[in-house]
Amino acid sequence: MNQQELFDKYQDTFAAQGQDLFFSPGRINVIGEHTDYNGGHVFPCAISLGTYGVYGVRDDDQVQLFSGNMEGDVVSFAITDEAPEEAEDRKWANYFKGMLVYLRQKGFKIDHGFNLYVYGNLPYGAGLSSSASIEMLMGQVLKDEFNLDIDQIDLVKLGQKTENDFVGLNSGIMDQFAVGMGKKDNAIFLDCNTLEYKYMPLELGDYEIVIMSTNKKHSLAASAYNDRVAECGEALKRLQTKLDINSLGEIDEDTFDEYSYLLNDETLLKRTRHAVFENQRTIQATKAMTDGDLEKLGRLINASHVSLHFDYEVSGTELDTLAEAAWQQPGVLGARMIGGGFAGSAIAIVKKDQAENLKQKVGEIYREKVGYDASFYDAEIVDGPHKL
């Protein structure tokens, strides 16, 4: 949908003219999966697929939201209404409402209503952080339209708080940080323990990143995700009987080997090994980027997928098929699942002149093995949320 079409949709929905158009990206994570809530490092970037919002001011106290992606009516509530939406066909609005509620609770002045028409081109359920994209879109709209003096990282933290406390989903800080702090042509090397970060140019030369979506319709990700968070929490508790640590991200491989006897449980051993080794792989990957060693980066990305399959057990047939099929294709440096797991997407780093071949060959293998089509997208690395 182009900009004019978005304004037309706003007009059709609210019988008024929209004033401003905003965009908020999705994200991919090059490496560092399931490390954010374990206090480790991640290496994500914002992508050109994302969420658009057309804003228009109202002269009453009502917020009216409409999604071009959801079936249903306009969701309307007063700016002073702090209760999460309970009805199934209104729950999507909580990602927006939570940001409004928490900004007002922090004392920011949001003193009149508004309309917001929202449309996203992120494939649904692809694990490209549509929820963080929405939260940071709302944050940016409110920041700009109401002239809120809030630091971008504080806005990112409110995005995570919305996800955790208002929507009720466990998540680390990575998704909101990657979206909210995105920078064109750069990935973000982020320490999720301290929120120290640095931008690193994603210089891939003759290579590009291709996003491969499973198009899987149903996902166990939410329940399994919460299980993994709990398992890592239990592992941390056992290690803390001898180690002065606050997160698994503080441990290196040698410390893991030395103190693994404290875990004394096969599942906890595997989960902790992934958290520790994936964190170290992420640190090594950024060094490989600095050294211009793309082949090493590719090997680390492959190792990440293997660890997510065997130790963290979150990949599943669809994601394994995509990654393993990509490994067999010419010009591919590395491929792995990204996101929570079980469904969603994988990425491949592939030579630009082999990208179409990758999409065709992996697509054929996937269709034959899984029974329906995968989708492929070229990842363009873009800035965070902004007014267009």
UniProtKB/Swiss-Prot annotation:
Site feature location: Transition state stabilizer: 27
Pathway: Carbohydrate metabolism; galactose metabolism
Class in the EC hierarchy, top level: transferase
Gene Ontology CC annotations of this record: cytosol
Residues reported in the UniProt entry to bind ATP: 67, 125-131
Primary location class: cytoplasm
Nucleotide-binding found in the keyword field: yes
Name of this chain's protein: Galactokinase
Species of origin: Limosilactobacillus fermentum (strain NBRC 3956 / LMG 18251)
Gene that encodes the chain: galK
